Structures are given as structure tokens and as C-alpha cells.
Amino acid sequence: MKILLIILLSYFVAPALSQNNIKLFAEKEDGKTILYLQNHEFSSVSFFLELSLSNMTALESPDHIYIIPPNTEKYKLAELSRIKRGRNSYAYTYKVVYGDITQLVYDHNYIYDLPYAKGRAFSIVQGYNGKFTHQNENALDFDMPEGTEIHAARGGRVIAVVQHFYESCLLEECKKKANYVLISHADGTIADYSHIQYNGAKVAVGDSVNKGQLIAISGNTGDTRGPHLHFICFLPGFEKRRGLQVKFKTGKGALATYLSEHKTYRKNYSSVR
């Protein structure tokens, strides 16, 4: 029996996911072909597999979303068998992103810290659903000069760091050249701190970080008109991540509020883990 493996398409929706960390592979067992996934990321991943079979059948429906735990060596995806004698083959496409895309519930009541040091104040140059680049996106842009220390708004696990880009522009090519740090939270949400400096990360993938911890240095990389910190808290999705509006402690920390465009917010409190 000859099995022809054809890879039609495989792509990563989240650019930080490494093809060295996510591997789909096949093994022969008792005359069957078993497809497995290896996940060496520090985050669970959502994986959608679509198979095209010729003279083969799958034990279960192959078009399925799988939630693969972090640091998994061998997660069974599909079991394929030949239908009759003769040439047989399979091809596949897949999508993969950080986190659990089936998750709909998160901690609505969690209060975030402002993502900078005590005593500093910065304004929001573009708010939730901003008219410039935040249409239908719940993200915030802090007017932050290059070289400013960025602190974690919430504790969690670092799941991605990109810091090798050094340029900025308004061309399409620069949309994928923003440096950033991604931190996953206990409730399944993920925070994205973008446009950090070249080599500006102060944490590494796999690190556990506390609220208020220094995580990066702000910069001006990627698709920008000037230096700023782009912050978004989101739940993952294959086509588009679901940005969330979250509240922050402001002033001396007694007030929790949604941040508004063109307003300045001072952080006069120390972060509490």
C-alpha cells in the first residue's frame, strides 16, 4: 500500500507561533495512519484540521477544532484507514492560534493596572473603536515616548516575544513588523503589548510575570505614525481575535474606569500581585 501525503496549505493565524514549536506528524499503526500534533508552546493552542481523503476514511469527522494543552508531545488528531486496494492519499489544511477559541467566559470584573511605572502619566491617543486604526477593535494606544518602561497590567505567563524588528512605516509591509510581548492570563484572556523597541523585551517566553513587573521598553516598530504603546486584551479567534474592553485603576488606585480617548491617566499607586 502506498500512501501519498500532500500538504495543501498550513498556516499560522498568529505570527508569533513557531513552526518549530507546532508540528503535525503521521505514524503507521496496525495498517492505519495516525495523525498527531506536537505543541511545544507555553500556551494551549486551538487547532483546526481539514482533511481531503482519496480512497481513505477517517474514524471520526476530521473537520474539527482541537484544544491542545501546552508542552504536549503527542496529541492524537485523526485515524485514517484505506477503503480498498489501490492508490490512496490524504491532504490537509489547518489553522492554529494561541489559546482556546471555544472559550466565551472570562473575568469581566478584573481590574487592570496602568501599564507603566508609578508616578508616570500618559494620554490615550486612540481609544476603543478609534476612528484611525481601531475600527471595531477594543484596543488602546498610549502616547508613550520611545524608551519608556512598560509594566504588566496583569500577571500571567509570557507566551510570545518578538523583538527583532527595528523599523516603522505606514506601508502594508510594516503591519507585520511590530515587536511585542504576549502574556496569557488565568481566565484565558491574552494581553498584547505592541510596538516595543528592537531588543526591548525584558521577559522571555515561559516566564511567569507579576502585575506591575517590568516587561518591555516602548518603541516605534511596525505600522505606526509615531512612538506609542498599543495594548489589547483579547480572547483568541481564527479569523479575528475578540478584543475586550477592560477597566484600569487610575489615580491613587481607588477608582476603576474604562480609559477614554484624549484623556491623561496618572498612576499614583504601587501594583499589588
Report residues per predicted region.
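Short, well-structured beta-strand-loop connectors
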Residues: I150-A160, K202-S218
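Short beta-strand and strand-turn-strand segments in soluble, beta-rich domains
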Residues: S54-D63
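Surface-exposed, glycine-biased beta-strand/turn segments
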Residues: I67-K177, S270-R273
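Short, hydrophobic/aromatic beta-strand segments
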Residues: S43-L51, A152
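Acidic, glycine-rich catalytic/binding loops that coordinate metals and/or anionic ligands
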Residues: Y110-Y116, V125, L171, K202-N210, ...
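Short histidine-centered loop motifs in beta-beta connectors
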Residues: P145, G188-G212
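Bacterial Sec-dependent N-terminal signal peptides
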Residues: M1-I22, L37
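Asparagine-centered strand-capping/turn motif at beta-strand->loop junctions
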Residues: Y36-S43
